[in-house]
Amino acid sequence: MLSPKKTRFRKQHRGRMKGISSRGNYICFGRYALQALEPAWITSRQIEAGRRAMTRNVRRGGKIWVRIFPDKPVTARSTEARMGAGKGDPKYWVAVVKPGRILYEMGGVTKNIARRAISIAASKMPIRTQFIISG
């Protein structure tokens, strides 16, 4: 699973996801990409599941770039815990994704293979996405 090696603070506020993505919304590395159409928190497990699905689908050919990184800790309390006594411990990590953000990129494969692999990865995501081609 992806997670930061070291952070300045252990816990973060939830924040809010307003507007569209102002960065990471152009294809930089590959030729094909998966772009988010809705705002969401995407967990490190979901990112990894999508990456594995794509890798398994393209086999040897092609290269895959993961363009998001989970850098926000999500805390949780145990189910039996009473109210109060502070914020819970970090449980998992999420990437904050806004509409327009590129999630994955792919290159070195044909359009059909890329579309199939990216659609499988898209099914692992908790949001609506679209397949885009650079150029």
UniProtKB/Swiss-Prot annotation:
CDD domains: Ribosomal_L16_L10e. It is found in: Plastid, Chloroplast. InterPro entries: Ribosomal_uL16, Ribosomal_uL16_bact-type, Ribosomal_uL16_CS, Ribosomal_uL16_dom, Ribosomal_uL16_sf. PROSITE patterns: RIBOSOMAL_L16_1 (PS00586), RIBOSOMAL_L16_2 (PS00701). Its main location: plastid. One of its GO terms (biological process) is mitochondrial translation. Keywords: Chloroplast, Plastid, Ribonucleoprotein, Ribosomal protein. PANTHER family: 50S/60S RIBOSOMAL PROTEIN L16, LARGE RIBOSOMAL SUBUNIT PROTEIN UL16M. Belongs to the universal ribosomal protein uL16 family. This is Large ribosomal subunit protein uL16c.
